[in-house]
């Protein structure tokens, strides 16, 4: 039983990625994400100018051969700021989701496996977090901590912990009564070994699927908090901050808000397409609905 279960766990991720590779929409999502990630990584070489360099003489220049995406109200090159802004948005999104995934999954597995009063207390706290809309909860936390990169990551991570914990708790409750878990207990395996070697591998694909979907939410939240002034403070280039400046000059300089908005749209679309493909591959019944 144990070897059969291990084989199933090892094969499932392979079949999951094989199914995703056959999905055309997933490839579109991967291409969009690859382009944005490549642009962020290569920003120092792709950016035509320093994103912080000001030139008041060239302020609010429309897209042209000299300034491909125009300039902002301080004469800074929009293309350069867009490329460097991708680095901040992706970094905040990935780190916050990774933090939420590690904490939330661990809490959910322990709560589901232990059960009892501990499970009730944990779920009560999670229900309180889930009662708040993601953006509102992130706004309150960011406002209390202050506007900087570290606090922004903490604020977004806290808003995403509860969903990961719920996803991990449900299979943990089911798996703790399975025969291979009972067999492990009879052989003297401790709770930590059972949770890490038997329960976690059987839910890892669900966690991966959720990570791709909630990463899009984290990037949207980062842009929203930056838009209202609770993200990375200026003069750092952030997509949300660029949209905020563009909103203030929307009648005179449409390009300031349009291009960062399109960048966010491309990333979120790519993540949603990839996440939907992962979800359909891991649960074929969802695609039949």
What are these regions (language model features)?
Residues 1-105, 109-110, 117-120, 131, ...:
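Gly/Trp-centered helix-boundary motif
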Residues 22, 36-40, 80-92, 96, 127-130, 139-143, 156-162, 213, ...:
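Alpha-helical transmembrane segments of multi-pass membrane proteins
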Residues 19-20, 59, 82-85, 89, ...:
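Amphipathic alpha-helical segments that mediate coupling or scaffolding at interfaces
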Residues 28-31, 92-96, 125, 138, ...:
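Hydrophobic core positions of alpha-helical segments in small-molecule transporters
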Residues 68, 72, 78, 102-103, ...:
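Generic hydrophobic transmembrane alpha-helix motif, especially the helices
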